[in-house]
Structures are given as structure tokens and as C-alpha cells.
């Protein structure tokens, strides 16, 4: 998003300056240029904020296997580096309206996917954002809901990988 850097600086610039934090924003396609960015910044950690779940929309619907391969390749590219992501896992309509003041469901680690979707009041069909294999095995992943609108929820995943 070409406006992201401007909006981030507008919203957080004062706090960044107060702490002496230096912010560098790359406005190119960071995923396409990831190998070069990683090489140029060997000590930098990487955070994907609402990026990885959107990749399926940059390809034709028939190229879902290509999207999955690209997402799995990230684990290889980022091996040995600290990185994290917050992304959509699935999204879709709900069987009943979501009250504005309702608590956001958080997934219990023992729940299987279908039970979790039941807790979200998911009404088929839900869109699979193809991010089920983003994180390496063994990484603690938090699953929680985000109420996009009164009748539509997103299942979000967040995780942080340490080398």
C-alpha cells in the first residue's frame, strides 16, 4: 500500500521521535524483493502485518497451489532469522449478527478447526486464505477472531519465530 508509510508516520511519528526510533519504510513489493532485502539487512527481524493472508487475492483463483508454495517457501527464506506474522487464516459470514460489545473468541489449543469455526458461528462457505502452513512446526500460534462487520468474521493467526 503506497499510503501505509505516510499513515504510519502520521499516527506514530511523535512516539517514534520521542524514543529515538529510526523508521525506514520500503514501498516496493517486499515479498517479491525479499531475498535482496534479507541480504541487505542480515540482522533485521521481519514482521508481516496483514500481508500473508492477502496473497491469494494477487493470483487467479485457480493458482491456489502456487500461493501455498510461495507461503511455504517463506519458512525457508527466513530460516535463522527472527520473524512474525499476523494474518487471516479464514473469513466468512456468521449465522447470527455479532453484537458490537461481544467478546472476541480466542481459540483453545485443543480445539480442532471445525469446532473452532462452530464457536465463531461460521456459516458456509468460508474463504480459506491458504495460510495454514505459514509457521514452522513447533511455533506457538495464537488463533482469535476479528469482527469485520456485524455479520462477517475473520479467523486471525499470530505467531513469532525465533531462530
Task: Outline where the language-model segments fall.
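Conserved beta-strand signature within the Rossmann-like core of class I S-adenosyl-L-methionine
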Residues: 45-48, 66-91
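A short SAM/SAH-binding and catalytic strip from SAM-dependent methyltransferases
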Residues: 31-37, 41-62
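Short catalytic/ligand-binding loop motif for oxyanion handling, primarily in non-cytosolic enzymes
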Residues: 7, 54-59, 92-95
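Charged, low-complexity C-terminal accessory regions
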Residues: 91-163
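Short beta-alpha junction loops
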Residues: 1-5, 87-92
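S-adenosyl-L-methionine
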Residues: 1-41
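A conditional alpha-helix N-cap/helix-loop micro-motif detector
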Residues: 27-28, 64-67
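Short, glycine/charged-enriched secondary-structure capping and boundary segments
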Residues: 11-14, 60-62, 99-100
Amino acid at each position: 500500500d503506497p499510503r501505509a508509510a505516510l499513515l504510519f508516520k502520521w499516527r506514530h511519528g511523535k512516539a517514534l521521535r520521542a524514543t529515538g526510533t529510526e523508521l525506514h519504510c520500503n514501498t516496493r513489493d517486499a515479498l517479491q524483493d525479499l531475498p535482496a532485502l534479507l541480504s541487505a539487512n542480515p540482522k533485521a527481524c521481519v514482521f508481516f502485518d496483514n500481508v500473508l493472508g492477502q496473497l491469494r487475492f494477487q493470483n487467479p483463483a485457480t493458482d491456489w497451489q502456487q500461493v501455498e508454495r510461495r507461503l511455504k517457501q517463506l519458512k525457508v527464506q527466513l530460516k535463522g532469522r527472527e520473524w512474525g506474522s499476523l494474518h487471516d487464516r479464514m473469513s466468512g459470514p456468521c449465522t447470527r449478527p455479532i453484537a458490537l460489545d461481544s467478546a472476541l473468541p480466542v481459540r483453545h489449543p485443543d480445539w480442532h478447526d471445525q469446532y473452532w469455526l462452530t464457536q465463531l458461528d461460521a456459516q458456509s462457505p468460508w474463504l480459506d486464505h491458504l495460510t495454514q502452513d505459514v509457521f514452522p512446526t513447533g511455533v506457538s500460534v495464537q488463533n482469535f477472531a476479528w469482527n469485520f462487520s456485524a455479520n462477517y468474521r475473520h479467523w486471525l493467526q499470530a505467531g513469532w519465530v525465533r531462530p
